[in-house]
């Protein structure tokens, strides 16, 4: 599933930072390693990806105005999610 992103809405950056995730890591996963994207609930997308440093992230986002990604949350993948992600690649 392809999602085209022009810009990011970081209004929840403090929440994301609580998970120890940096904005550049989220951007990398969404822009460069977005081959595994699932449709979530309430018009959201779940993106599974690996940062350029090998960190496995799970990102939830919503698309606003057609091409702006509002990052709702981001965290490290659980062990089970990593296994699922690896089996689907």
Question: Which residues fall in each region the model found?
Answer:
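Ribonuclease/tRNase effector modules and their secretory precursors
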Residues: 1-89
């Amino acid at each position: 599933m392809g999602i085209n992103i022009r810009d990011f809405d970081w209004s929840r950056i403090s929440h994301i930072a609580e998970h120890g995730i940096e904005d550049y890591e989220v951007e990398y996963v969404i822009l460069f390693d977005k081959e595994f994207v699932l449709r979530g609930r309430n018009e959201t997308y779940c993106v599974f990806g690996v940062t350029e440093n090998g960190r496995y992230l799970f990102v939830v986002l919503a698309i606003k105005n057609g091409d702006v990604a509002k990052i709702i949350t981001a965290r490290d993948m659980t062990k089970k999610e990593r296994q699922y992600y690896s089996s689907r690649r």
